[in-house]
């Protein structure tokens, strides 16, 4: 018989940097989860992701206070800032003030990283999804309609 689920916790934690301080500690403590055990297993699971990239995680908490978790890929906006804007932030007025240019190749690279978490049917649809995010951040998109 499957374990009884008592809750889900959604957090965004920097890869390889989970520690018991807020927001991790209080969120897990409310559900009675062993915080140190989660931090160690999360840091181990995210060791192949670049350290410091915000990584969404969905934690499933069971009645016996055990847990399991699923890590997702970093948000598209974070990847766009990293690869296209080189750390700068997006535009406050994206329709009038452009802050950078994204090539189709850059968008394709990000789309390939995000494919497991996107609902896109194919790579082309994933590229268009990432291009939409880029446009909403004030990034000019080249080579994508």
UniProtKB/Swiss-Prot annotation:
Hydrolase found in the keyword field: no
GO terms for cellular component: cytosolic large ribosomal subunit
PROSITE patterns given in the database record: RIBOSOMAL_L11
Keyword Ribonucleoprotein assigned: yes
Any one GO biological process: translation
Superkingdom assignment: Bacteria
Pfam families: Ribosomal_L11, Ribosomal_L11_N
SUPFAM superfamilies documented for this protein: Ribosomal L11/L12e N-terminal domain, Ribosomal protein L11, C-terminal domain
PTM characteristics: One or more lysine residues are methylated.
PANTHER family: 60S RIBOSOMAL PROTEIN L12 (PTHR11661), LARGE RIBOSOMAL SUBUNIT PROTEIN UL11M (PTHR11661:SF1)
Quaternary organization: Part of the ribosomal stalk of the 50S ribosomal subunit. Interacts with L10 and the large rRNA to form the base of the stalk. L10 forms an elongated spine to which L12 dimers bind in a sequential fashion forming a multimeric L10(L12)X complex.
Family: Belongs to the universal ribosomal protein uL11 family.
Function according to Swiss-Prot or TrEMBL: Forms part of the ribosomal stalk which helps the ribosome interact with GTP-bound translation factors.
NCBIfam families reported for this sequence: L11_bact (TIGR01632)
Protein name: Large ribosomal subunit protein uL11
Species annotation: Coxiella burnetii (strain RSA 493 / Nine Mile phase I)
């Amino acid at each position: 018989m499957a374990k009884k689920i008592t809750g889900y916790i959604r957090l965004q934690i920097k890869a390889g940097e989970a520690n018991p301080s807020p927001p991790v500690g209080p969120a897990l403590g409310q559900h009675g989860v062993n915080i140190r055990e989660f931090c160690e297993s999360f840091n181990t699971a995210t060791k192949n992701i670049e350290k410091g990239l915000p990584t969404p995680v969905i934690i499933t908490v069971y009645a016996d206070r055990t847990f399991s978790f699923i890590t997702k890929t970093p948000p598209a906006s974070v990847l766009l800032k990293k690869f296209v804007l080189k750390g700068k932030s997006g535009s406050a007025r994206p329709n009038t003030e452009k802050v950078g240019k994204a090539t189709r190749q850059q968008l394709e690279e990000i789309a390939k990283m995000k494919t497991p978490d996107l609902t896109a049917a194919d790579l082309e649809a994933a590229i268009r999804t990432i291009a939409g995010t880029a446009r909403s951040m004030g990034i000019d998109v080249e080579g994508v309609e």
